[in-house]
A protein has these predicted regions:
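Residue-level signature of the transmembrane alpha-helical core
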Residues: 14, 37-40, 69, 97-100, ...
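A cytosolic-side transmembrane-helix exit/cap motif
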Residues: 54-59, 111-122
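Core segments of transmembrane alpha-helices
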Residues: 12-19, 70-79, 106-107, 129-141
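Active-site His/Glu-centered metal-binding helix of metallohydrolases
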Residues: 15, 44-52, 69, 73, ...
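Membrane-embedded alpha-helical segments that form the functional core of polytopic membrane enzymes
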Residues: 16-65, 78-98, 156-171
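C-terminal membrane-associated helical module and adjoining short loops/tails
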Residues: 1-7, 17, 27, 35-43, ...
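Membrane-water interface of transmembrane alpha-helices
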Residues: 104-112
Protein backbone atom coordinates (compact mmCIF):
# COMPACT_ATOMS: atom_id res chain seq x y z
CA UNK A 1 0.00 0.00 0.00
CA UNK A 2 1.35 3.38 -1.03
CA UNK A 3 1.35 5.85 1.85
CA UNK A 4 -0.08 9.27 1.13
CA UNK A 5 1.70 12.45 2.27
CA UNK A 6 -0.82 13.23 5.08
CA UNK A 7 -0.34 9.69 6.45
CA UNK A 8 3.46 10.05 6.29
CA UNK A 9 3.17 13.28 8.32
CA UNK A 10 0.98 11.54 10.90
CA UNK A 11 3.41 8.63 11.21
CA UNK A 12 6.22 11.19 11.48
CA UNK A 13 4.38 12.77 14.42
CA UNK A 14 4.36 9.41 16.21
CA UNK A 15 8.08 8.89 15.47
CA UNK A 16 8.90 12.33 16.93
CA UNK A 17 7.48 11.32 20.35
CA UNK A 18 10.34 9.04 21.54
CA UNK A 19 12.89 11.62 20.33
CA UNK A 20 10.92 14.29 22.23
CA UNK A 21 11.08 12.14 25.39
CA UNK A 22 14.84 11.61 25.11
CA UNK A 23 15.60 15.30 24.54
CA UNK A 24 13.38 16.26 27.49
CA UNK A 25 16.03 14.87 29.83
CA UNK A 26 18.91 16.90 28.38
CA UNK A 27 19.94 19.32 31.16
CA UNK A 28 20.06 23.09 30.75
CA UNK A 29 19.32 25.32 27.78
CA UNK A 30 18.98 22.59 25.14
CA UNK A 31 16.78 20.53 27.45
CA UNK A 32 14.20 23.34 27.23
CA UNK A 33 14.73 24.35 23.62
CA UNK A 34 14.85 21.05 21.70
CA UNK A 35 11.69 19.45 23.22
CA UNK A 36 9.84 22.74 22.63
CA UNK A 37 10.76 22.80 18.93
CA UNK A 38 9.99 19.09 18.50
CA UNK A 39 6.57 19.54 20.12
CA UNK A 40 5.79 22.58 17.95
CA UNK A 41 6.91 20.66 14.84
CA UNK A 42 4.73 17.67 15.77
CA UNK A 43 1.76 19.95 16.52
CA UNK A 44 2.20 21.69 13.16
CA UNK A 45 2.12 18.34 11.32
CA UNK A 46 -1.28 17.74 12.97
CA UNK A 47 -2.62 20.86 11.25
CA UNK A 48 -0.71 20.20 8.02
CA UNK A 49 -1.75 16.57 7.47
CA UNK A 50 -5.44 17.45 7.73
CA UNK A 51 -5.03 20.46 5.44
CA UNK A 52 -3.16 18.48 2.77
CA UNK A 53 -5.66 15.61 2.98
CA UNK A 54 -8.50 18.04 2.24
CA UNK A 55 -6.69 20.03 -0.48
CA UNK A 56 -5.48 16.98 -2.41
CA UNK A 57 -8.49 14.84 -1.51
CA UNK A 58 -6.24 12.26 0.12
CA UNK A 59 -8.40 11.53 3.15
CA UNK A 60 -8.14 7.86 4.08
CA UNK A 61 -9.29 5.34 6.67
CA UNK A 62 -5.65 4.92 7.76
CA UNK A 63 -5.46 8.67 8.36
CA UNK A 64 -8.74 8.63 10.30
CA UNK A 65 -7.32 5.86 12.49
CA UNK A 66 -3.79 7.21 13.03
CA UNK A 67 -4.43 10.96 13.38
CA UNK A 68 -6.28 10.90 16.75
CA UNK A 69 -3.88 8.23 18.05
CA UNK A 70 -0.86 10.39 17.16
CA UNK A 71 -2.45 13.42 18.86
CA UNK A 72 -3.22 11.51 22.05
CA UNK A 73 0.27 9.97 22.26
CA UNK A 74 1.89 13.40 21.80
CA UNK A 75 -0.32 15.25 24.31
CA UNK A 76 -0.31 12.47 26.93
CA UNK A 77 3.48 12.12 26.75
CA UNK A 78 4.05 15.87 27.08
CA UNK A 79 1.64 16.21 30.03
CA UNK A 80 3.17 13.25 31.89
CA UNK A 81 6.68 14.66 31.43
CA UNK A 82 5.60 18.14 32.58
CA UNK A 83 3.98 16.66 35.70
CA UNK A 84 7.05 14.51 36.32
CA UNK A 85 9.49 17.45 36.25
CA UNK A 86 7.23 19.65 38.41
CA UNK A 87 6.25 22.19 35.75
CA UNK A 88 2.63 21.11 36.28
CA UNK A 89 2.22 20.63 40.03
CA UNK A 90 -0.23 20.69 42.97
CA UNK A 91 -3.81 21.44 41.88
CA UNK A 92 -2.63 22.08 38.31
CA UNK A 93 -2.30 18.30 37.94
CA UNK A 94 -6.13 18.15 37.99
CA UNK A 95 -6.21 19.98 34.64
CA UNK A 96 -3.81 17.39 33.17
CA UNK A 97 -5.93 14.53 34.58
CA UNK A 98 -9.11 16.04 33.06
CA UNK A 99 -7.44 16.25 29.65
CA UNK A 100 -6.03 12.70 29.78
CA UNK A 101 -9.30 11.20 31.10
CA UNK A 102 -11.28 12.84 28.34
CA UNK A 103 -8.91 11.47 25.68
CA UNK A 104 -9.38 7.91 27.01
CA UNK A 105 -13.16 8.41 27.23
CA UNK A 106 -13.44 9.74 23.68
CA UNK A 107 -11.34 6.85 22.31
CA UNK A 108 -13.79 4.39 23.86
CA UNK A 109 -16.80 6.37 22.62
CA UNK A 110 -15.42 6.51 19.06
CA UNK A 111 -15.04 2.74 19.03
CA UNK A 112 -18.53 2.21 20.47
CA UNK A 113 -20.22 4.63 18.06
CA UNK A 114 -18.26 3.29 15.08
CA UNK A 115 -19.93 -0.11 15.66
CA UNK A 116 -23.27 1.65 15.20
CA UNK A 117 -21.85 3.40 12.11
CA UNK A 118 -22.20 6.77 13.80
CA UNK A 119 -19.48 9.24 12.93
CA UNK A 120 -18.22 11.58 15.64
CA UNK A 121 -17.58 14.76 13.72
CA UNK A 122 -14.89 17.06 15.07
CA UNK A 123 -16.55 20.36 16.00
CA UNK A 124 -15.09 23.86 15.74
CA UNK A 125 -14.97 24.00 19.54
CA UNK A 126 -12.98 20.75 19.63
CA UNK A 127 -10.48 22.24 17.19
CA UNK A 128 -10.18 25.34 19.41
CA UNK A 129 -9.67 23.06 22.42
CA UNK A 130 -6.87 21.22 20.62
CA UNK A 131 -5.18 24.49 19.60
CA UNK A 132 -5.27 25.91 23.17
CA UNK A 133 -4.10 22.55 24.55
CA UNK A 134 -1.11 22.44 22.18
CA UNK A 135 -0.32 26.12 22.83
CA UNK A 136 -0.39 25.70 26.62
CA UNK A 137 1.92 22.67 26.48
CA UNK A 138 4.31 24.41 24.07
CA UNK A 139 4.55 27.44 26.39
CA UNK A 140 5.12 25.23 29.45
CA UNK A 141 7.89 23.39 27.60
CA UNK A 142 9.91 26.60 27.23
CA UNK A 143 10.85 26.37 30.93
CA UNK A 144 13.21 29.03 32.27
CA UNK A 145 13.92 30.36 28.77
CA UNK A 146 10.22 31.16 28.39
CA UNK A 147 10.08 32.80 31.82
CA UNK A 148 12.98 35.09 30.87
CA UNK A 149 11.41 36.03 27.54
CA UNK A 150 7.87 36.48 28.89
CA UNK A 151 7.82 38.26 32.23
CA UNK A 152 5.24 40.97 32.75
CA UNK A 153 4.47 41.84 36.40
CA UNK A 154 3.05 38.59 37.89
CA UNK A 155 2.71 36.88 34.52
CA UNK A 156 5.52 34.81 33.07
CA UNK A 157 5.48 31.97 30.52
CA UNK A 158 4.75 29.41 33.24
CA UNK A 159 1.71 31.33 34.54
CA UNK A 160 0.31 31.92 31.04
CA UNK A 161 0.85 28.25 30.15
CA UNK A 162 -1.03 27.10 33.27
CA UNK A 163 -3.92 29.53 32.63
CA UNK A 164 -4.22 28.16 29.08
CA UNK A 165 -4.01 24.59 30.41
CA UNK A 166 -7.00 25.25 32.70
CA UNK A 167 -8.90 26.85 29.80
CA UNK A 168 -8.11 23.78 27.72
CA UNK A 169 -9.33 21.53 30.57
CA UNK A 170 -12.62 23.48 30.73
CA UNK A 171 -13.13 23.15 26.96
CA UNK A 172 -12.16 19.48 27.27
CA UNK A 173 -14.97 18.94 29.81
CA UNK A 174 -17.49 20.81 27.66
CA UNK A 175 -16.69 19.03 24.39
CA UNK A 176 -16.29 15.71 26.21
CA UNK A 177 -19.78 16.08 27.69
CA UNK A 178 -21.20 16.70 24.20
CA UNK A 179 -19.59 13.52 22.85
CA UNK A 180 -20.62 11.53 25.95
CA UNK A 181 -24.24 12.68 25.57
CA UNK A 182 -24.27 11.41 21.96
CA UNK A 183 -22.83 8.10 23.12
CA UNK A 184 -25.39 7.67 25.92
CA UNK A 185 -28.27 8.63 23.58
CA UNK A 186 -27.09 6.02 21.08
CA UNK A 187 -26.73 3.34 23.80
CA UNK A 188 -30.26 4.05 25.13
CA UNK A 189 -31.63 3.98 21.58
CA UNK A 190 -29.97 0.59 20.94
CA UNK A 191 -31.29 -0.83 24.24
CA UNK A 192 -34.81 0.40 23.41
CA UNK A 193 -34.70 -1.31 19.99
CA UNK A 194 -33.54 -4.58 21.58
CA UNK A 195 -36.37 -4.47 24.16
CA UNK A 196 -39.06 -4.19 21.50
Amino acid sequence: MKLKIPNILTIGRIIIVPIFVLTFFIPGFFGDLIPFFLFVLASFTDYLDGLLARIFKEESKLGELLDPIADKILVATALILLVMNGTIKNYEVIAAIIILTREILISGLREFLAKGQIDMQVTGLSKLKTFIQMLSIAILLTGEIGNKLINFQDYNAQTIGIILLWLSAFLTLYTGYDYLRKGIDHAIDQDTKEDR
